[in-house]
Every structure is written in structure tokens, then in C-alpha cells.
């Protein structure tokens, strides 16, 4: 076991920088005949069903020929989408519109719901004030980050929607609670960097990953997370959590592998399940280390599975850690203190 001291500026382990830009082309596309291509765009023979129209200062969607399944329109000046923009490409599967000037009022009609094969829709870094729609039932991955969204429309019927990225918007908890209830396939939800003061009610119980960092959340309702029976990754860093707002067993979730409570106002370590592997508590107000927060009892077969534990930026020091901590955290690779 390593007991180390790190600078407070150390980046979080498991940074997700760039995590929502996954544009790899499936291998099965190799060897196909390239379709016709819009003259201003690029349709390489190595990716015959992909059309790249990035960084062209386009102000509207170009002509998209039949056969295109993967359409990239990033870093342009597109400020509207006509209802007939994709009539020739009913087999379109990926539509990437990041870094444009789109507003909701200029996205016409049912332009997206007509795309019955659409799986990925990315409209990050635009000027949206609410979610787009209606959307096709085929959709699996919706990314609307870095907009000005304060309202979510209906997601009814999106039975395949698995990933939703909504970070860096202006969402409050009521807007979220009313919209996501029926998404039974949803596994990944990122609501970080919004304006929530409470945890939203009615989130789908199918979630495996939930990011709520960089909000203004100060209270965890009793047994709020208990219904998420498969939850594995939970981030609540950079909120306003204090001991008074965190019931005793809030995070005692047997499925949880990673919990981030860093940059809050906690004075004691919230109890976690022995299955937790990564626990981030840096920059709180922790005054003591209670072994019972990790191990209810100690024995040959009773110990915590913690691998990484961050405690730096707290009043705790290495000398204040109790000796039985090492027996409880016997498989830890790294414990960071001041």
C-alpha cells in the first residue's frame, strides 16, 4: 500500500476529458463502394458511407446523397435545418452537428424523427435553449452539451436511448424530473455543470453512471440512491454537501464502484459499501477517519475493496489515521493524504 501526499492541483483519477466525442468508424464499412459526395465535403474511400463536412464555414446543411450513414458537420456556421434536409438519407445513423449556431426555432418540423435508423445525435456547443425533438425510437446516444438548455421536452417512446449528455447547460431539477422518467434503457446520464439545488426526482432506475458534479446540491433525500440497483459510477463533487444533508447510508450501495464527493463541506466520511473501489473525498472538512465508514467488522474475509482513496485537502494527516485502517483497506493501492 502506498500512502502518498499529492498537490491539491492534482487532476482527478479517471478524468473524462473528451469522453463524449466518440467518432470511430465501424470496421464493417471498409471495402464498400463510396457513394456520391457533396462537392464541398469529403467522402473517403476508406469510409465509404461517411461524409465529412467539418470546418467549411457552412451556413446550411449541404446536399447529402443517398447511401450516407455517418454525417459530420462540425465547426461550421449552420444556424438552421430545413425539414427536408435529410430526405435523401433515411439510413443515416450518426449525425454530428457540434460547434454550430443552431437555435431551436430554426430546426424545422420532424427533421430528426424521420431518420428511422438514427443512433447518434450530437448537437454540442450550439445555441439551444431546450432539447430537440421529436426524436426517432432508434436513438441510442444524445449529446446536447454546452448549450443554454433550461427546458427538456418529452423523451417518450425512446426505448433505445442509453446515453444522455447534458452537462454545461442551465437545467434545474424540476426540468429534469419531468422528462426522463420513462427511459427504461438509460444507463449513462451526465447533468454536471448545471443549476440544480436538489437531486431530480424520477430518474430512471436503469442508470449505471450518474454525474451530478458542479451543481448546488446540498441535500440527499433518505434512500434516494437505493432504487438504482445497478449504479456503478456516481459523481457529486463541487456541490454544497454537508453532514447534515447526507443521511447515514446514502451511499451504501452494493453495486457502486466509484464515488466522487470531493470539494464539498463534509466533516465525516459517509459510509460506503465494502465493494466500492474508488473513493474521492479531497478538499472537504474531514476531521477524523472512522474505519466503520468502510468496514462494519474486521476479519480475514471482511475488508474493503477500496483501491484508490483521496483524502488530501482535509485536516486529516497521515499520523492521525488509525492503525486498523490498514487492515480494513488491505487491498488499497493508493491512499492520498496531506
UniProtKB/Swiss-Prot annotation:
Tissue localization of expression: Cornea and other tissues.
Location of Phosphoserine modifications: 304
Secretion signal, residue range per the UniProt entry: 1-18
Disulfide bond annotation, renumbered to this chain: 295-328
One Gene Ontology term, aspect cellular component: collagen-containing extracellular matrix
InterPro entries: Leu-rich_rpt, Leu-rich_rpt_typical-subtyp, LRR_dom_sf, LRRNT, SLRP
A Gene Ontology BP annotation from the UniProt entry: positive regulation of transcription by RNA polymerase II
The record's account of how the chain is modified after translation: Contains keratan sulfate.
UniProt GO MF annotations: collagen binding
Keywords on record: Disulfide bond, Extracellular matrix, Glycoprotein, Leucine-rich repeat, Phosphoprotein, Proteoglycan, Pyrrolidone carboxylic acid, Repeat, Secreted, Signal, Sulfation
Gene3D superfamilies listed in its UniProt record: Ribonuclease Inhibitor
Pyrrolidone carboxylic acid sites (modified residues): 19
PROSITE patterns: LRR (PS51450)
UniProt family annotation: Belongs to the small leucine-rich proteoglycan (SLRP) family. SLRP class II subfamily.
Listed name of the protein: Lumican
Species: Mus musculus (Mouse)
Species classification: Eukaryota, Metazoa, Chordata, Craniata, Vertebrata
Gene: Lum
Amino acid at each position: 500500500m502506498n500512502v502518498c501526499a499529492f498537490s491539491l492541483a492534482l487532476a482527478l483519477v479517471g478524468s473524462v476529458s473528451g469522453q463524449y466525442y466518440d467518432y470511430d468508424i465501424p470496421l464493417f464499412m471498409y471495402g464498400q463502394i463510396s457513394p456520391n459526395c457533396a462537392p464541398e465535403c469529403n467522402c473517403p474511400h476508406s469510409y465509404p458511407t461517411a461524409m465529412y463536412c467539418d470546418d467549411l464555414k457552412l451556413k446550411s446543411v449541404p446536399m447529402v446523397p443517398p447511401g450516407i450513414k455517418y454525417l459530420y458537420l462540425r465547426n461550421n456556421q449552420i444556424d438552421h435545418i430545413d425539414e427536408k434536409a435529410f430526405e435523401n438519407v433515411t439510413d443515416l445513423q450518426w449525425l454530428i452537428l457540434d460547434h454550430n449556431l443552431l437555435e431551436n426555432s430554426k430546426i424545422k418540423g420532424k427533421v430528426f424523427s424521420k431518420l428511422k435508423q438514427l443512433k447518434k445525435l450530437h448537437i454540442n456547443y450550439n445555441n439551444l435553449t431546450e432539447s430537440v425533438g421529436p426524436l426517432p425510437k432508434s436513438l441510442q446516444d444524445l449529446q446536447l452539451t454546452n448549450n443554454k438548455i433550461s427546458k427538456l421536452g418529452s423523451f417518450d417512446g425512446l426505448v433505445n436511448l442509453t446515453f444522455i449528455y447534458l452537462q454545461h447547460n442551465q437545467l434545474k431539477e424540476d426540468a429534469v424530473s419531468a422528462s426522463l422518467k420513462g427511459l427504461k434503457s438509460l444507463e449513462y446520464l451526465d447533468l454536471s455543470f448545471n443549476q440544480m439545488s436538489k437531486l431530480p426526482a424520477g430518474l430512471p432506475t436503469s442508470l449505471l453512471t450518474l454525474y451530478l458534479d458542479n451543481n448546488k446540491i446540498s441535500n440527499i433525500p433518505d434512500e434516494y440512491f437505493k432504487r438504482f440497483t445497478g449504479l456503478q459510477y456516481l459523481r457529486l463533487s463541487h456541490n454544497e454537501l454537508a453532514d447534515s444533508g447526507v443521511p447515514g447510508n446514502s451511499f451504501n450501495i452494493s453495486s457502486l464502484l466509484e464515488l466522487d464527493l470531493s470539494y464539498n463541506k463534509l466533516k465525516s466520511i459517509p459510509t460506503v459499501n465494502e465493494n466500492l473501489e474508488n473513493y474521492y473525498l479531497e478538499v472537504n472538512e474531514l476531521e477524523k477517519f472512522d474505519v466503520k465508514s468502510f468496514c462494519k467488522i474486521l476479519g480475514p474475509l471482511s475488508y474493503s475493496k477500496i483501491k484508490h482513496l483521496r483524502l488530501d485537502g482535509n485536516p486529516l494527516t497521515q499520523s492521525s489515521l488509525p492503525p486498523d485502517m490498514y487492515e480494513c483497506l488491505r487491498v488499497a493501492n493508493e491512499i492520498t493524504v496531506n
